[in-house]
Amino acid sequence: MLAKFKKKYIGDWDFYQKYLLLAIPMILQNAITNLVSFLDNIMVGQLGTEQMSGVAIVNQLIFVYNLAIFGAVSAASIFGAQYFGKGNHKGHMYSFRFKLYATLLVTGGAILLFLTKGSALISLYLTDTVGNGATDVALKYGQEYLAIMMVGLIPFAVNQSYATNIKETGQTFIPMLASFVAVGTNALLDYLMIFGIGPFPKMGVQGAALATVIARYIEALIVIIWAHMHRAKNRYLEGAYTGFGIPFAELKAILVKGFPLMMNEVMWAAGMTTVTQCYSVRGLDVVAGLNIASTITNLFNIVYLQLGSCISIVVGQYLGAGKLKEAKDADDKMIVFSVFCCVIMAALMFVVGGFFPGIYNTSEEIKGLATQFIAVSAIIMPFCAFSHASYFTLRSGGKTVVTFLFDSVFTWVIVVPAAYLLAHFTGLGIVSIYFLVQGTEMIKVIIGYYMVKSNVWVVQMV
């Protein structure tokens, strides 16, 4: 029995070496990014609860925008990688054009929305349960932060268009280097501008926003300048700006195959922010506690998120080569490994996570809420690892409609209604509500298990 289990679910050293060589650079890059985000969050947290909450709410809104951008570039990347693999540089150029158009269209829509409805969107997350006027102060800081952050949306969009195309050519170092430079710049400028160190004025939340915007421009410039200085490695740039068209066949293919993926990213992100809005009706303390908890959780969930993402790459390679049996075997082993690693990280987070809220300059009530939210997240995290791995297994076989149903439709049909009903129509405490809503992941685990087991994803597309 044990030997059978080991053969099916545990690989040899060569297997894990290949898997980890792919995953570790991605884990490190995301670890550095999230660590800087954590430091940024702490620095803003030193300013006070209202400042921290205002910034956290705006970041929730920008999170939806970011995922919309990722969805737009992912839709074209499905074809971009294959165009490059075939040596079809013109096709690769058309996918690049699509990314530019799609990301700039999304950005234009986001800026228009934030300009006209920004205050109203922020106010959705502000419920004054104690009558001390703190929500008005948080709204003011949120408006200040959003006004500056909008300036950084365009370079972010253009950078994603370039960086994803560069990665499709196998040149992953430059986007990673640009990201490291950006997060380092962001961290340094955060410290100088938030607190007014040296010649810099004390700008508070405006300083945090300005530091992020400057870092976005630096990252975009590094990537764009490198791409145009190395045209031989970036053949998709040939003719990219000498015309504006995309052949109808290519455009239709990208939209048909990529639209569910694009909508999935947007709807899932919107669903998650809606869940947060449901929690926020329980007061500003809840918003602040969730902000602290999510920042800490993001430090610990990097491992399972990146291990899960690698599944689509490794399994996709086997499927593309027609090695369907090997694809199923690798998938079983990688899912088990991802969950195993997540159990270790979750246990670590459960033990040490409670120490982090003490760093913040906020009330003991908020620190207590954050500690309990972190503990709940640690308990649920291994289940999230399994459903995440299941999602990328289905995606590796090109089942974009299935992943759309599995991810965003599940969020809107199960998670959002659960959060809304529990927050608005029960007398349960917020921690109990949070646990029950997070617990809906169990349903997703069961669905994911049967979907993966059905082998509906075992498809050779090329």
Spell out what each predicted region is.
Residues 28, 40-44, 55, 80-85, ...:
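Hydrophobic/aromatic residues within transmembrane alpha-helices of membrane transport systems
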Residues 73, 77, 148-168, 175-186, ...:
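Short runs within selected transmembrane alpha-helices of multi-pass transporters and secretion channels
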